[in-house]
């Protein structure tokens, strides 16, 4: 592997599989095949599927949090548009959905630790929006952080399931319309 550790390559392959087919369909054998190693080598880095799933969500949450920190919040409309763009990028990436949307859809059948980490991802997003609303109280009238996150995640699932990206676009346009009022 040039420039990337085997552990990162395994995480990349596992994330792609979860985002496309779901956590329950991801197997160590398939991930190993994607990376070009034996499944025992995947177990070396991640002894259990739960360990791999937890590491996936932690990494995804960290990357997303870093992107949130890069958003300049001095202009409410621009900041909200950049937030929505992060979700849009997750939908467009490999024509799949946000990792945590995929895991959230399977939440009743995944391990407790993965479910907790997935919930933490959503809380990071909600808290970021709440902070933005506190910075711009007159601009945020009528907006709720949980409504925005739930709407974007739901629209992502709907767009992915039906193949109609316009569903996501309609929801994001409605959210951003509030910045023009």
Q: What is the meaning of each model-derived region?
A:
Residues 112-123, 134-179:
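Hydrophobic/aromatic-rich alpha-helical bundle segments in the mid-to-C-terminal region
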Residues 91-116:
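Amphipathic alpha-helical segments used for helix-helix packing
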Residues 55, 69-96, 145-148:
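Hydrophobic alpha-helical connector segments
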Residues 6-9, 13-51, 55:
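Helix-turn-helix
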Residues 10-18, 60, 87, 152:
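Short hydrophobic clusters on alpha-helical segments that form packing/core surfaces
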Residues 58-64:
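Short, basic, alpha-helical segments at the C-terminal edge of helix-turn-helix-like DNA-binding modules
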Residues 1-5:
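N-terminal intrinsically disordered/low-complexity leader segments
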């Amino acid at each position: 592997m040039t420039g990337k550790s085997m552990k990162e390559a395994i995480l990349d392959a596992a994330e792609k599989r979860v985002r496309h087919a779901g956590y329950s369909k991801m197997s160590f054998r398939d991930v190993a095949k994607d990376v070009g190693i034996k499944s025992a080598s995947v177990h070396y880095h991640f002894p259990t599927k739960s360990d791999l799933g937890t590491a996936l969500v932690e990494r995804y949450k960290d990357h997303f949090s870093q992107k949130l920190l890069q958003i300049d919040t001095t202009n409410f409309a621009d900041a909200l548009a950049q937030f929505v763009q992060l979700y849009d990028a997750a939908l467009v990436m490999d024509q799949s959905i946000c990792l945590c949307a995929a895991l959230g859809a399977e939440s009743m059948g995944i391990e407790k630790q993965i479910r907790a980490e997935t919930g933490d991802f959503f809380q990071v997003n909600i808290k970021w929006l709440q902070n933005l609303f506190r910075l711009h109280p007159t601009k945020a009238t009528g907006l709720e952080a949980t409504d925005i996150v739930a709407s974007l995640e739901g629209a992502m699932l709907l767009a992915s399931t039906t193949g109609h990206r316009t569903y996501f676009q309609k929801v994001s346009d409605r959210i951003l319309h509030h910045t023009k009022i």
